[in-house]
């Protein structure tokens, strides 16, 4: 029997990706990013303050928050605010987004400012954290470009681009950019964050069904490099538009 994916995509094919800039009115940067049916609103907000541990050091800070709308999935989930605390998954993902974006910022060039990336999942169909990172980078770029245009900073603080994609082993085959049916039924699931210099910022990989081999890991990383390369092209095209 020949291998096929539920979506009909080839093993190395991304879902259709759209990056819509200036999606909301008030934020210094805002992007609606779509990976197939996964849609995440990413906004960048600039504040002229830094956390206490950075006061007086002349450095800026980049951080992130992540959340899912109650009906972003098949069944409604209570808002975390109604529960009184954020869940472990939410905290893990927003820390990942913050780490990924700080990896592309010269915080000295930013000055004593904080840029907060709010990533709100409007609709989830797998890969929300990787979509959030990819879209949040573009929102961040718009925010720092505005700071430069206003003369608030003198030097561009971005030292590269960042994007992320999921890969996994689905029915024995390495595949790129898992959607929900694949993610919920895969043997291995991995999230890969990279910069546009070819460097890896973070790898998150877990065997769900059976342990993966070194050759399978190599195949997954090769797929991720291909996919992230395509995402960098889409980011550049969006920022040039």
UniProtKB/Swiss-Prot annotation:
This is Ribonuclease PH. CDD domains: RNase_PH_bact. One of its GO terms (molecular function) is RNA binding. One of its GO terms (biological process) is tRNA processing. It comes from Xanthomonas campestris pv. campestris (strain ATCC 33913 / DSM 3586 / NCPPB 528 / LMG 568 / P 25). The gene is rph. Keywords: Nucleotidyltransferase, RNA-binding, rRNA processing, Transferase, tRNA processing, tRNA-binding. Phosphorolytic 3'-5' exoribonuclease that plays an important role in tRNA 3'-end maturation. Removes nucleotide residues following the 3'-CCA terminus of tRNAs; can also add nucleotides to the ends of RNA molecules by using nucleoside diphosphates as substrates, but this may not be physiologically important. Probably plays a role in initiation of 16S rRNA degradation (leading to ribosome degradation) during starvation. It catalyses: tRNA(n+1) + phosphate = tRNA(n) + a ribonucleoside 5'-diphosphate.
